[in-house]
Each structure stands twice: as structure tokens, then as C-alpha cells.
């Protein structure tokens, strides 16, 4: 069965989902039947074809009236502001990938369902009343047919949750802190300009900028036992893609740095293959651009202090890795719903 997908919002994640679908060779499993985006179709086609972070798209892209063509595949283009007015029933949509970054409540998900979609997957953390939140590689096996409105969490949650799970299962985590070192995003300014967050009034290319993060809440959503025992801070840095996460945890069992690395390396080669990778080369952030893994552990940066404090550095392509997980979760949702 081929899953019929519609994409709502054709920004960074929406476009990368389409690129990842074609580059990963999964068109027999997923077909994009429609994209809803308020921008004009010519601009959509141009930004799909030419991307500053990921280069030229290898597939031919063209726009004709209300259709976007990728190769010979026609995708209907919509410019609808009202979720309730979207023609999902007419188009036979199985799963809507809502990549707007704006919608994320149960009410928004129900609007897609009312318009005719069978399932909805949000590309960012949703409200607590969604059916479930998935970090693929960790809990997708808990998906059920009755789960209609789902969140794919965030890029940073997908990056750090697998590593936390591995360390907790092996050594027993007592508490932890996380620092996200995230590339600049669209909600920052090119030059100094007004923003409700005064730090984000400043030019993104000129400063390391602290921002608020809900990553600690995302961690405790998956690990309730860590409530009040994990904290997170975040800074934005003047790069356009790839993120690093500095993770520090105190653990119950004594451990050495080489043992931590061996654990994570074996996981990357085994149970978490394709989700977690492990590297010991002297690499920098740009080397992880277009990497499809959720997390790449930098073994050169692992430290252990006093046998119980572990520090690790984990990389991710916050666009490309997450877009690939959107596809994985879509297939997982369809498998349990339509088998």
C-alpha cells in the first residue's frame, strides 16, 4: 500500500520532507498528493529546487498553474488559510504532515480530520492532549490504530532522547543538564529589528544568542521519572544548519569514558542503526550537513568525571535528520492503521 500524504506548510521542514522522500527512494511507500502553502507556487518550486543548506535538488522541478511537478509526479498546490476548507477527503489523504510550525493543538488536528484526513502528524511538539508523541527509534512501537493526531516531537528531542535512553538503561541516570547549540532560525533577524524577545532583536549572523527552550519538558514527557531532575538551556549560533547538544548526566553506576563510547558505538551499529551514528573523526558542524541520522555521537568529546558524571556531545542536522524521521513516523502510523 502507498500512503497518500498531504503537506501543510512548505517551509524548511516541508521542503526537506519532499526532498528526503525522493532521495531515499521511498516513493513506492509514500506519495505526496498535495501541498498547502500560502506562498506562490513559483516560489515553492524555486526553493524546492535550490537550497542554500542542501544544494540543488537532483530531480527536475517545475510549476504549472496549480500543480508542482517533481519528475513526472504531479502534486496539487493549494493556498488555503482555513484548515476546515482543505480538500483532504476529495484527495483521499491518509496522513497530513503539518509542517507549519504554527499549528499543534488537538483542535488543529481535528480540523484536518474533519476535512477528510485519516491521520495528522505535526512536525513540532504539540499540546499535551494529542494522542501521542513519537521519537522514532525509541517509542514508535507504541503507536496504535486509534492514534489519529500525533506529534513527531522536535529535532533536538529526536537527537537527545535516544542517547538519554541508552545511558539510562546502562547506568541509571539520576539527573542531567542539556545545552542546545542550535543554528540560527527563521524567527531571528537578519539585521537588528524589533522582536518580542529582546535578544532576538539582534542580528543572527553577529552573535551567539540565548533563547528559551522547552527541551527539558520534552525529555520528561518521555521519561516522567526525570521530572525536576533535568534542565535545559539553548543558544543560537551564526550558522544556518546543524546543531550540537552538550549533554551532562550523573549516573548511579560507576563508568569510564571508553565504556560510554563503546556502549554508544555498539548501539549505532545495532539496535539504533540508522537513528544514532557514532564518529571519532575530527569533524566540525558542516560535516554533518545532510546527515539523515537523528543523532551523531562525537566520541572524541566524551568525558567522565568522578566515575559518575558523563558529558557527551551529540550532533544532528536539525533539518534533514528530522525530515527523514517525519517519513519514518508516517510509515509507522500507516502500518498500524491500515494493515
Curated annotation (Swiss-Prot):
Question: Pathway it acts in?
Answer: Cofactor biosynthesis; pyridoxine 5'-phosphate biosynthesis; pyridoxine 5'-phosphate from D-erythrose 4-phosphate: step 1/5
* Key word Cell membrane present: no
Q: Which Gene3D superfamilies match?
A: Dihydrodipicolinate Reductase, domain 2, NAD(P)-binding Rossmann-like Domain
What is the catalytic activity of this protein? D-erythrose 4-phosphate + NAD(+) + H2O = 4-phospho-D-erythronate + NADH + 2 H(+)
**Entry GO MF terms:** erythrose-4-phosphate dehydrogenase activity; NAD binding
Biological process terms in GO annotation: pyridoxal phosphate biosynthetic process; pyridoxine biosynthetic process
Where's the active site on this chain? 155
Do you know which CDD domains this protein is assigned to? GAPDH_C_E4PDH (cd23937), GAPDH_N_E4PDH (cd17892)
Q: What is this protein called?
A: D-erythrose-4-phosphate dehydrogenase
Amino acid at each position: 500500500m502507498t500512503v497518500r500524504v498531504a503537506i501543510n506548510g512548505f517551509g524548511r521542514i516541508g521542503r526537506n520532507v519532499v526532498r528526503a522522500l525522493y532521495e531515499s527512494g521511498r516513493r513506492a511507500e509514500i506519495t505526496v498528493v498535495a501541498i498547502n502553502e500560502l506562498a506562490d507556487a513559483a516560489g515553492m518550486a524555486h526553493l524546492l529546487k535550490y537550497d542554500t543548506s542542501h544544494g540543488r535538488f537532483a530531480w527536475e522541478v517545475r510549476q504549472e498553474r496549480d500543480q508542482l511537478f517533481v519528475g513526472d509526479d504531479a502534486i496539487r498546490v493549494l493556498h488555503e488559510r482555513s484548515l476546515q476548507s482543505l480538500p483532504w477527503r476529495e484527495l483521499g489523504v491518509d496522513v497530513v504532515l503539518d509542517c507549519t510550525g504554527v499549528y499543534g493543538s488537538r483542535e488543529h488536528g481535528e480540523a484536518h480530520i474533519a476535512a477528510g484526513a485519516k491521520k495528522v502528524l505535526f512536525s513540532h511538539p504539540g499540546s499535551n492532549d494529542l494522542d501521542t508523541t513519537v521519537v522514532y527509534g525509541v517509542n514508535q512501537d507504541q503507536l496504535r490504530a486509534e492514534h489519529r493526531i500525533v506529534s513527531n516531537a522536535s529535532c533536538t528531542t529526536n537527537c537527545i532522547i535516544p542517547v538519554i535512553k541508552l545511558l539510562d538503561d546502562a547506568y541509571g541516570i539520576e539527573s542531567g543538564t542539556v545545552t542546545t547549540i542550535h543554528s540560527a532560525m527563521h524567527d531571528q533577524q537578519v539585521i537588528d529589528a524589533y522582536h518580542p524577545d529582546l535578544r532576538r532583536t539582534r542580528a543572527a549572523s553577529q552573535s551567539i544568542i540565548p533563547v528559551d527552550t522547552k527541551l527539558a519538558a520534552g525529555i520528561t514527557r518521555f521519561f516522567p521519572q526525570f521530572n525536576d531532575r533535568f534542565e535545559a538551556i539553548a543558544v543560537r549560533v551564526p550558522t544556518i544548519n546543524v546543531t550540537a547538544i552538550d549533554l551532562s548526566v550523573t549516573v548511579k553506576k560507576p563508568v569510564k569514558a571508553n565504556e560510554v563510547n563503546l556502549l554508544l558505538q555498539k548501539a549505532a551499529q545495532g539496535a539504533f542503526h540508522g537513528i544514532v551514528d557514532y564518529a571519532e573523526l575530527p569533524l566540525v558542524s558542516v560535516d554533518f550537513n545532510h546527515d539523515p541520522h537523528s543523532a551523531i555521537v562525537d566520541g572524541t568529546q566524551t568525558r567522565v568525571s568522578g566515575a559518575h558524571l558523563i558529558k557527551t556531545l551529540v550532533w544532528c542536522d536539525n533539518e534533514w535528520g528530522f525530515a527523514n524521521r517525519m517519513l519514518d513516523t508516517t510509515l509507522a502510523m500507516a502500518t498500524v492503521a491500515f494493515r
